[in-house]
């Protein structure tokens, strides 16, 4: 896992993501963070992971129910409840890499904060199943649309 490797190397996790070989991590335009997060609604259900270094929370849900309150951008659908301090977001990536448990490629959109820690990760595929062509196309569309120039 990228977090464990980052800890072993003594670097922020975002640096491990940036160093992935062969275009496996494409940096996205984090300046378009709201548009990017809203685009995740079109994916349908996704596996969302949030970790604070002590606890990891995983939920399978769908993006939607967007609103802004103070410093937070909120995602509040029937299956997902996230409150993002958007001013803390510093990087975003479309990541395609082998899963840590089974080696089957995972497709994800990952957001990192100013310290280089993962804010949250959104997996389009997770858990050992090869992604259907439709999911791969959705991932590629996000990767191309939001690619940092």
Predicted regions and their residues:
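Eukaryotic intrinsically disordered, low-complexity regulatory linkers and tails enriched in Ser/Thr/Pro
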Residues: 1-149
């Amino acid at each position: 896992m990228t977090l464990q490797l980052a800890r072993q190397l003594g670097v922020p996790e975002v640096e491990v993501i940036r160093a992935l070989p062969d275009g496996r991590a494409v940096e996205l335009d984090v300046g378009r963070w709201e548009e990017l997060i809203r685009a995740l609604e079109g994916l349908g259900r996704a596996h969302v992971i949030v970790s604070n270094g002590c606890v990891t929370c995983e939920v399978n849900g769908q993006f939607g129910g967007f609103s802004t309150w103070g410093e937070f951008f909120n995602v509040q659908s029937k299956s997902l409840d996230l409150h993002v301090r958007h001013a803390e977001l510093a990087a975003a990536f479309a990541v395609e890499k082998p899963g840590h448990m089974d080696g089957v490629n995972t497709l994800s959109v990952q957001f990192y904060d100013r310290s280089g820690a993962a804010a949250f990760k959104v997996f389009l595929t997770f858990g050992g199943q090869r992604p259907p062509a439709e999911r791969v196309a959705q991932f590629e569309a996000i990767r191309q649309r939001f690619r940092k120039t």
